[in-house]
């Protein structure tokens, strides 16, 4: 009696190599259900192999530093440079050596539905996490570039007192005035897993803040646009005026501050 399709599917779930002899054995099984299960498992393995290769490539900076003797590499990234409202948020994350988290990438490349899952995975596996938040008032005072630096420095400071302290910093497109060895990486959130981890922590943290602001200041769509200048946000500005979290140094908010006809 031939093996049931259900049993074959269960056997295939345990297969992790495309060279497994089970594939060759099942290739001669004419049942449509078996062939569908066979192709499905092969495709899943190919997807897993591609993901493993991608994650391995994103560890290249970290692996080079491990070879030089560095043990605790912190990735640093920020979210919120461009919005018209809300803070700029930076995160500093130290992952265990050679740590790979499936799906971890530049937060802009991760589907929103998966943000929370990957964020939780980073929180569970990270050796240390620091978060720096600079509000809109300080952004207006010092400019967004300097505010981003301050947020990053605050994120590093938040690691003080935690068990693991960084001996090297990988930073997304920024150099910081701090006595820790560091490297600035252009598009670092897409090229370093440590920076990608910081990217998703900063992203989810800021999105949660903006969702809270949406409840306090309805009508601007903050929960959906995170403070960026979308059509809904601009319509809200026109209808309801400027809120306490708007950046008055950013246009069109800046011009509205000088226009006495605005609400």
From Swiss-Prot:
Gene Ontology CC terms, in alphabetical order: cytoplasm; ribonuclease H2 complex
UniProt xrefs under Pfam families: RNase_HII
Subcellular location: Cytoplasm
Enzyme Commission code(s) on record: 3.1.26.4
Reaction equation(s) it catalyzes: Endonucleolytic cleavage to 5'-phosphomonoester
Keyword NADP: no
GO MF assignments: manganese ion binding; RNA binding; RNA-DNA hybrid ribonuclease activity
Residue positions binding a divalent metal cation: 77-78, 172
Cofactor needs: Mn(2+); Mg(2+)
InterPro entries: RNase_HII, RNase_HII/HIII, RNase_HII/HIII_dom, RNaseH-like_sf, RNaseH_sf
Note on cofactor: Manganese or magnesium. Binds 1 divalent metal ion per monomer in the absence of substrate. May bind a second metal ion after substrate binding.
Record key words, sorted: Cytoplasm, Endonuclease, Hydrolase, Manganese, Metal-binding, Nuclease
Protein name, entry field: Ribonuclease HII
The species this protein was found in: Streptococcus pyogenes serotype M6 (strain ATCC BAA-946 / MGAS10394)
